[in-house]
Amino acid sequence: MNYLVMISFALLLMKGVESVRDAYIAKPENCVYHCAGNEGCNKLCTDNGAESGYCQWGGRYGNACWCIKLPDDVPIRVPGKCHR
């Protein structure tokens, strides 16, 4: 039984764990990508590894791209100022 656990753990480490989240995709200076429609956001999000994306109308940061299942290595909008 211990061998099965160890083999499972080793396979998990070899494969790696990919974490995703739903969030506003951000530019390097912590600014959101503003939008007018869903097509541009969906392309931006999927090009960055997300499952999909859409334009969040009237959200916290105005009309901005929201991504579904965005990988952890892609920057997201975090609290604080946009440094343009």
From Swiss-Prot:
Protein name in UniProt: Toxin BmKaTx13
Function (record text): Alpha toxins bind voltage-independently at site-3 of sodium channels (Nav) and inhibit the inactivation of the activated channels, thereby blocking neuronal transmission. This toxin is active against mammals.
Stored SUPFAM superfamilies: Scorpion toxin-like
Expression across tissues: Expressed by the venom gland.
Organism: Olivierus martensii (Manchurian scorpion)
Biological process, per Gene Ontology: defense response
Keyword terms of this UniProt record: Disulfide bond, Ion channel impairing toxin, Neurotoxin, Secreted, Signal, Toxin, Voltage-gated sodium channel impairing toxin
Gene3D superfamilies, A to Z: Knottin, scorpion toxin-like
UniProt xrefs under InterPro entries: LCN-type_CS_alpha_beta_dom, Scorpion_toxin-like, Scorpion_toxin-like_sf, Scorpion_toxinL, Scorpion_toxinL/defensin
Primary localisation category: secreted
GO CC annotation: extracellular region
Propeptide: 84
Gene Ontology MF: a single term: sodium channel inhibitor activity
Disulphide bridges, residue numbers: C31-C82, C35-C55, C41-C65, C45-C67
Secretion signal, residue range per the UniProt entry: 1-19
Domain LCN-type CS-alpha/beta: 21-83
Pfam family, any one: Toxin_3
